[in-house]
């Protein structure tokens, strides 16, 4: 049986932790940051786990 290919867009956006959780970046931290409070941009820096409802779909895209 052939190997599954990783969806390249998903491969760039998500990473799998050592325990198998899927992590993603938060939105709203690419541009137009001047008017956003520093507190908000600091909090947006951290990665967060993918929602449970989306995890199965993302795993399929990542070929896992």
From Swiss-Prot:
GO MF terms, alphabetically ordered: structural constituent of ribosome
Pfam families: Ribosomal_L35p
GO CC terms of this entry: cytosolic large ribosomal subunit
InterPro entries from the UniProt entry: Ribosomal_bL35 (IPR001706), Ribosomal_bL35-like (IPR021137), Ribosomal_bL35_CS (IPR018265), Ribosomal_bL35_sf (IPR037229)
Coiled-coil region(s): none
Keywords tagged on the record: Ribonucleoprotein, Ribosomal protein
GO biological process, one term: translation
Keyword Ribonucleoprotein: yes
Homology family: Belongs to the bacterial ribosomal protein bL35 family.
HAMAP family: Ribosomal_bL35 (MF_00514)
Protein name per the record: Large ribosomal subunit protein bL35
Organism: Acidothermus cellulolyticus (strain ATCC 43068 / DSM 8971 / 11B)
Gene: rpmI
